[in-house]
Swiss-Prot record:
Protein name per its UniProtKB record: Snake venom serine protease homolog KN4
Source organism of this protein record: Trimeresurus stejnegeri
Propeptide stretch(es), residue numbers: 19-24
Primary location recorded for the protein, binned into one broad class: secreted
Cell compartments where the protein resides: Secreted
Keywords (A to Z) from UniProt: Disulfide bond, Glycoprotein, Hemostasis impairing toxin, Secreted, Serine protease homolog, Signal, Toxin
Disulphide bond pairs: 31-165, 52-68, 100-258, 144-212, 176-191, 202-227
Expression by tissue: Expressed by the venom gland.
Length: 260
């Protein structure tokens, strides 16, 4: 009986430790250097750290989140490690920025989207290539890929030298509506994460892509604080719902309006 109790206690301790450890793995593992050719990093002139991510959708345009807007944005493309420079890395600044609303008046559950026109086009290369816009809306149950240079621990922040990637699941919006106070009953956003916690986007990942079944379906918007908590999936701007606005802006119709 004593031996059984000892073994049972050891099992409980192991399970407890495993649960706590998994809660710290926010960004997953290092991304393969060849899987994020479309991923860009946003920073400001005086900053030493990237404050957001973005997605290159063609040679001249980047899609990110409105919350990522800053006065002096710089954009780095073709990067993997912050310590080792790729030969084909390129830097750009915005020529124009477009929003559904002013970046100061967007809501955390609606219209968190920013379309950036680069000051000059980029060329495809070993580490740079655009990601196509989605041809179909996502469906609940999809496996989705997240990536970025954001913190891999929370609430204490640890920023990696390379982007981290993880797989999460797409849930019905009602899951996020129940998890986060203040969310409206309907929204042009997606709800994605891992219900047991442990995998999530976090500070520094905003604006980056949510790729579901190979299609660019979401833009990292916001989530719980601390990040990666159980039953608190993240909220992502739904790209498919904004396709008409994006395509109109790119085509030159700069007065196009976003969906209500």
């Amino acid at each position: 009986m004593v031996l059984i109790r000892v073994l049972a206690n050891l099992l409980i301790l192991q399970l407890s430790y495993a649960q706590k450890s998994s809660e710290l793995i926010i960004g997953g593992d290092e991304c393969n250097i060849n899987e994020h050719r479309f991923l860009v990093a946003l920073y400001t002139f005086r900053s030493r750290r990237f404050h957001c991510g973005g997605t290159l959708i063609n040679q001249e345009w980047v899609l990110s989140a409105a919350r990522c807007d800053r006065k002096n944005i710089r954009i780095k493309l073709g990067m993997h490690s912050t310590n080792v420079t790729n030969e084909d890395e390129q830097r750009r600044v915005p020529k124009e920025k477009f929003f559904c609303l002013s970046s100061k008046t967007y809501t955390q559950w609606n219209k968190d989207i920013m379309l950036i026109r680069l000051n000059s086009p980029v060329n495809n290369s070993t580490h740079i290539a655009p990601l196509s816009l989605p041809s179909n809306p996502p469906f609940v149950g999809s496996v989705c890929r997240i990536m970025g240079w954001g913190t891999i621990t929370s609430p204490n922040e640890t920023y990696p030298d390379v982007p981290h990637c993880a797989n999460i699941n797409l849930f019905n919006y009602t899951v996020c509506h129940g998890a986060h106070a203040g969310l409206p009953a309907t929204s042009r956003t997606l709800c994605a994460g891992v219900l047991e916690g442990g995998k999530d986007t976090c500070k520094g990942d905003s604006g980056g892509p949510l790729i579901c079944n190979g299609q660019f379906q979401g833009i990292v918007s916001w989530g719980g604080d601390p990040c990666a908590q159980p039953r608190e999936p993240g909220v992502y701007t739904k790209v498919f719902d904004h396709l008409d606005w994006i395509q109109n802006i790119i085509a030159g119709n700069t007065t196009a309006t976003c969906p209500l």
